[in-house]
């Protein structure tokens, strides 16, 4: 039997990278009526326009048996593509991989495309669906997420930034999502918390539910974090596409030349 060629190996790795988490995580995702990161990017961008970066990156943590689970991509899909023929940079957290938590390589990957967007003066679109910091990676993860926040702050006022919150987002992910110019929360699944909702006493004892404390209506009417509420995921993508991209490109160019 002939040995597999290097191109066959590459195809196998690419197929593995395109597999979102394990089967149980994927079933849980489907049960909630949510889509995978790649499906969301496919819906957001023009067909066939997505160019992915760092699809084979893996975390390097060894504690807490993390060496036994090293999925390709480390729970985030990132790259650039087109919306109505205009170039944008985008990323999407994959809740089916480590619950979308942000580890060292996950954060570095997002930081890389954010820096590319700033240097290229392109809009940055983030699809957020993650449980914040990946505690298993400890201070290594903290350092990388700190660098990411620095880059996002540097992007503020330089390029248009969009955050689509399509799941329960907590901790550093919520903080990062809130730095955008346009924050769009999905009415069904979009929630934002500065700490895990499962650690909040009022939620634990049933005094309030997650939506009342961190849901889309709460952030649109009281906290002011949300600019718009989307009826569902497709509506969130449509809203993003309808925002005048030509205007945002013009403003980015003017900011660069000033």
Enumerate the language-model features and the residues they cover.
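A generic structural signal for short coil/turn motifs at secondary-structure boundaries
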Residues: 98-102, 135-136
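Conserved small/polar residues in nucleotide/adenosyl-binding loops
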Residues: 248-257
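Glycine-rich anion/phosphate-binding loops
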Residues: 70-71, 100-112
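N-terminal amphipathic, basic-rich helices that act as targeting or association modules
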Residues: 2-77, 82
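Conserved catalytic cores of soluble enzyme domains
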Residues: 128-243
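A structural preference for short, pocket-lining loop segments at secondary-structure junctions
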Residues: 80-94, 109-136
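Short glycine-rich loop/turn motifs
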Residues: 74-78, 87, 122-123, 149-150, ...
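Glycine-rich phosphate- or other oxyanion-binding loops that anchor nucleotides, phosphorylated ligands
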Residues: 89, 102-106, 144-147
């Amino acid at each position: 039997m002939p040995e597999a060629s290097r191109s066959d190996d590459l195809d196998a790795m690419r197929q593995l990278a395109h597999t979102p988490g394990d089967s149980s995580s994927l079933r849980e995702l489907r049960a909630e009526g949510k889509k995978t990161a790649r499906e969301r990017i496919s819906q957001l961008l023009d067909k066939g326009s997505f160019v992915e970066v760092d699809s084979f990156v893996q975390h390097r943590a060894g504690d807490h048996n993390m060496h036994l689970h090293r999925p390709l991509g480390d729970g985030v899909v990132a790259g650039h593509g087109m919306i109505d023929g205009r170039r944008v940079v985008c990323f999407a957290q994959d809740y089916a991989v480590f619950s979308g938590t942000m580890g060292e390589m996950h954060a570095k990957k997002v930081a890389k495309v954010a820096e590319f967007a700033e240097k290229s003066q392109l809009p940055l679109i983030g699809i957020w669906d993650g449980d914040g910091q990946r505690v298993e990676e400890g201070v290594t993860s903290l350092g990388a997420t700190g660098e990411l926040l620095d880059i996002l702050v540097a992007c503020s006022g330089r390029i248009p930034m969009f955050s689509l919150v399509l799941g329960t987002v907590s901790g550093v992910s919520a903080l990062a999502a809130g730095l955008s110019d346009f924050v769009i929360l999905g009415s069904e699944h979009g929630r934002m918390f500065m700490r895990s909702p499962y650690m909040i006493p009022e939620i634990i004892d049933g005094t309030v539910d997650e939506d009342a404390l961190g849901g889309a209506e709460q952030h649109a009417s009281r906290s002011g974090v949300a600019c718009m509420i989307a009826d569902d995921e497709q509506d969130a993508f449509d809203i993003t596409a309808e925002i005048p991209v030509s205007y945002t490109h013009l403003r980015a160019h003017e900011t660069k030349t000033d």
